[in-house]
């Protein structure tokens, strides 16, 4: 069973951004968008060799999160993104005049009555 370990609100005004980071000691991480934004959340695989280009162009119609070391998602209002906490992610600079607002959270596995993880 997973439980929320922490939860917080992000209010990114014009010019605000977040650099690449991970969420250690978590089972899952997520973000729920309360507003739309043209500026994406960006993901980067933690293993450098995955981030270097090694796919054969002849086999790739278009790059996506399954065949790339980096990708992005443009936030849409009322959208929930859940991702592994070890996945590097950052938020692009908000260049809009309105605030970008989201709720982020992490989960952990709940210990059983003997203090052990299931």
Model-derived segments and their meaning:
Residues 5, 26-28, 37, 99, ...:
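Residues that flank catalytic or metal-binding motifs in active/ligand-binding sites
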Residues 9, 91, 105-107:
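Short beta-strand element of the conserved SAM-dependent methyltransferase core
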Residues 10-82, 113-118:
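Catalytic core of non-heme Fe(II) oxygenases with the double-stranded beta-helix
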Residues 18-21, 89-96:
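Short beta-strand His + acidic residue motifs that chelate non-heme Fe in jelly-roll/DSBH
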Residues 30-31, 97-113:
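A short hydrophobic beta-strand segment most commonly corresponding to one strand
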